[in-house]
A protein has these predicted regions:
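DUTPase catalytic domain/fold
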Residues: 1-108, 114
Length: 114
């Protein structure tokens, strides 16, 4: 399977985990948030998924413990139509405490096929 990836400012090259079929995505920017604040954190990539595939954006198990943020929609779904050069993937974050999420903070993505 071939997935075309475009990296934007601040993007970290994708890391395919050695076990399983997950890809670690990272925050492409340093973000300071206050408790109760919402922000979409850029992941710095656009991808063209193969026809019939979708990606799931979910937090790592340590994201809340380390950074005090929750993914606002619990799981993001990106379908194959969100594939333009400027369709930058993001992580919708809700801060539960004052925090600074540093560039290169690992988040997580998974692709599934039809």
């Amino acid at each position: 399977m071939k997935i075309l990836v475009r990296y934007h400012d601040g993007a970290v090259p994708l890391t395919v985990l050695p076990q399983g079929d997950w890809i670690d995505l990272c925050a492409a920017e340093t973000v300071t948030m206050h408790a109760g604040e919402f922000r979409i954190i850029s992941l710095g990539v656009s991808m063209q998924l193969p026809e019939g595939y979708e990606a799931h954006i979910v937090p790592r198990s340590s994201t809340f413990r380390k950074w005090g943020i929750l993914q606002a929609n619990s799981m993001g779904v990106i379908d194959e139509s969100y594939c333009g050069d400027d369709d930058v993937w993001g992580f919708p974050a809700l801060a539960m405490r004052d925090t600074t999420t540093v560039s290169y903070t690992h988040l997580r993505a998974h692709e599934t096929g039809a």
